[in-house]
A protein has these predicted regions:
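Bacterial N-terminal signal peptides
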Residues: 1-7
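Terminal recognition/anchoring or ligand-binding modules at protein termini
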Residues: 9-44, 61-141
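A contiguous, well-structured pocket-lining segment that forms one wall/lid of small-molecule binding clefts
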Residues: 53
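Primarily EF-hand calcium-binding motifs
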Residues: 57-59
Length: 141
């Protein structure tokens, strides 16, 4: 799992340290981590750029950059950022609920996986690490 987190090391240490300290990750930080981690955003971009990228696509949450995201919302953003396909229910109704269920089913989200629960910065980074590891092994496509 640490391999996935190491691949995010190009980002500034200060930013990662700030995320790790967050008891509830914000939309802007979540969007930035996911898009930079997926290679869809340059690390020199801002959290506002990352949020705007999601807001112009299918995973728009309509939240402010400083608003916290739930596990379901984070899962939806992750599935969108990494192009992870979902099962029948997610395909029919892509929503935070079904995104969280899909990522729990695929062992990306480990432990409790309630769509409305808070996501700490540490857990957000663990989820990205897991996505990168499973993607590398071809188990998410």
């Amino acid at each position: 799992m640490m391999g996935g987190i190491v691949s995010l090391s190009a980002q500034s240490n200060e930013f990662i340290d700030g995320v790790l300290e967050q008891p509830r990750i914000t939309y802007g930080n979540a969007a930035y981590l996911l898009l930079v981690g997926s290679g869809d955003l340059d690390e020199s971009a801002t959290v506002n750029d990352a949020r705007d990228r999601f807001e112009s696509g299918a995973a728009a949450l309509g939240s402010g950059v400083d608003e916290p995201v739930t596990l379901g919302e984070y899962s939806l953003l992750a599935m969108n950022a990494f192009g992870i396909t979902g099962g029948v229910m997610y395909t029919m109704a892509p929503s935070p609920r079904y995104a969280a269920r899909e990522l729990a089913f695929r062992d990306v989200v480990q432990g409790r996986a309630y769509p409305r629960m808070d996501v700490s910065g540490e857990r957000a980074l663990r989820i990205i690490g897991r996505v990168l590891d499973l993607n590398e092994g071809g188990r998410l496509q």
